[in-house]
Amino acid sequence: MDTSRKIIHIDMDAFYASVEQRDHPEFRGKPLIIGGDPNKRGVVATCSYEARKFGVHSAMPTRQAAKLCPNGIFIHGNMAHYVEVSNQIREIFSRYTDIIEPLSLDEAYLDVTENKKGMKSATMVAREIQQTIYQELGLTASAGVSFNKFIAKIASDFKKPAGITVVTPEEAEAFLEQIPVTKFYGVGKVTAEKLHRLGIETGADLKKWSEWDLIRELHKHGYHLYRHVRGRSNNIVNPHRDRKSVGKETTFEFNVLDSRVLEQSLMQFAKKVEERLIKLQKHGKTVVLKLRYSDFTTITKRLTLNEYTNDTSQIYQAAALLLRESYTGQDSIRLIGLTVTNLKPVYFENLRLEGL
């Protein structure tokens, strides 16, 4: 395990909402919710910390957010402006290193092992970047500093907002033992439920399990979780990263025959894929359905749409059509997956922020 890298994960604090509060004094100190009209279909893209005190969070339906926070201010937001500010932040990063891996508009990995300023301390680099962003742009960022990307990302969320958390190689395993497994990369709702049923709530619980037992229970997720909780993870920051597809799949605890259960899974996947596509500022044209039967036979079917989309309904309808054409109901399904590929950037004026 290489522990020599110095990696920073920078995560802007409530980015879209913070930009709006910076630019519009009337929003400051008030519960601001970006996600469109609460009387129409929509999902919260992000919200200010004032709104979060009421239980509002990203990916929540705007109608639910309005019930939790009746005095909330709802706006659609301005994606083109957020992109502009994100580029300004990226320029600040580039003063320290060219090894930058953006994850979205508001977060990125930086490898500062050999940085342009010749600074030996990654902690000092992170602190200086935070200060520069605040001084020049009037925005706050949180930072995680460690020797691999997985730990740095978890650490950046530890002291929000405007915090900095450093995890050295010597501290890594103890740090990870206290973290809820729901914070681990790749642990979604389904995996979290499986872990809960197994009595695994924290990294410490996870660490008690052997690699083989985790793989048996959780398949590939088990392999990755075994490595993550021991601080063994990818430490290569990739400045050329570009997502070619966005997808979601799950292995059922019990084999499934009921097509309605499969359709429900596809709807959940379509919502998650839409959320990821919008965060990446992309839309896609090809929907791919993956089915694995109880005998481990795997098929994939794809449908290319007439136009690009990042809309839940359109993605689901295409996937459901593929399911109806592919699945007879005679053999049980072990795994189902949905992927959108053939991606390209979204034009700002067409971005469906209100539908995140």
UniProtKB/Swiss-Prot annotation:
Domain UmuC: 1-188
Disulfide bridge map: none
Catalytic residues, chain numbering: 107
A GO cellular component entry from the record: cytosol
Sites marked Substrate discrimination: 16
Cofactor: how bound: Binds 2 magnesium ions per subunit.
PROSITE patterns given in the database record: UMUC
Signal peptide region: none
Reaction equation(s) it catalyzes: DNA(n) + a 2'-deoxyribonucleoside 5'-triphosphate = DNA(n+1) + diphosphate
Pfam families named among the record's database cross-references: IMS (PF00817), IMS_C (PF11799), IMS_HHH (PF11798)
Principal subcellular localization: cytoplasm
Cofactor: Mg(2+)
Keyword Cytoplasm set for record: yes
Record: residues binding Mg(2+): 11, 106
Keywords: Cytoplasm, DNA damage, DNA repair, DNA replication, DNA-binding, DNA-directed DNA polymerase, Magnesium, Metal-binding, Mutator protein, Nucleotidyltransferase, Transferase
GO biological process: DNA-templated DNA replication; error-prone translesion synthesis; SOS response
Gene Ontology MF, one: magnesium ion binding
Subcellular location: Cytoplasm
Family designation: Belongs to the DNA polymerase type-Y family.
Subunit structure: Monomer.
Functional description taken from the UniProt entry: Poorly processive, error-prone DNA polymerase involved in untargeted mutagenesis. Copies undamaged DNA at stalled replication forks, which arise in vivo from mismatched or misaligned primer ends. These misaligned primers can be extended by PolIV. Exhibits no 3'-5' exonuclease (proofreading) activity. May be involved in translesional synthesis, in conjunction with the beta clamp from PolIII.
PANTHER family: DNA POLYMERASE KAPPA, DNA REPAIR POLYMERASE UMUC / TRANSFERASE FAMILY MEMBER
Protein name: DNA polymerase IV
Organism: Listeria monocytogenes serotype 4b (strain F2365)
Gene name of this polypeptide: dinB
